[in-house]
Amino acid sequence: MIKGIGLDMIDLDRVKQAVEKNPRFIERILTEKETKQYEKYEGSRKIEFLAGRFAAKEAYAKANGTGFGKHLSFTDVEILQVEDGRPHVTMPIKQGETVFVSITHTARSAAAQVIIEQ
């Protein structure tokens, strides 16, 4: 049974400006493991990765029904790549839940959809 569906989209320029204004923005969004993946990329691919994770985490919070705030922060949600390159939510997974995530990019934006099944 589907517990929730979340969708989010963000402009790449908005993410780039946030990083330029405050480099600690990256620490607010990415976990340590995600940051290691982020650091492997160069140039515009870094912004695409960060924007994709931002959108995916927003989509997760929407699918979860909580949004971000007192009970959930960006670094509480971790999305890593499995060996075949697909994104996979590694935390927080509640017992009995399956989380599906899809991330896409264009030249100007990143979008993500999350479905949580229970």
From Swiss-Prot:
Its EC number is 2.7.8.7. It is found in: Cytoplasm. Signal peptide: none annotated. GO terms for molecular function: holo-[acyl-carrier-protein] synthase activity; magnesium ion binding. Its cofactor is Mg(2+). It catalyses: apo-[ACP] + CoA = holo-[ACP] + adenosine 3',5'-bisphosphate + H(+). It is an enzyme of class 2 (transferase). Its main location: cytoplasm. InterPro entries: 4-PPantetheinyl_Trfase_dom, 4-PPantetheinyl_Trfase_dom_sf, ACPS, Ppantetheine-prot_Trfase_dom. This is Holo-[acyl-carrier-protein] synthase. It comes from Listeria innocua serovar 6a (strain ATCC BAA-680 / CLIP 11262).
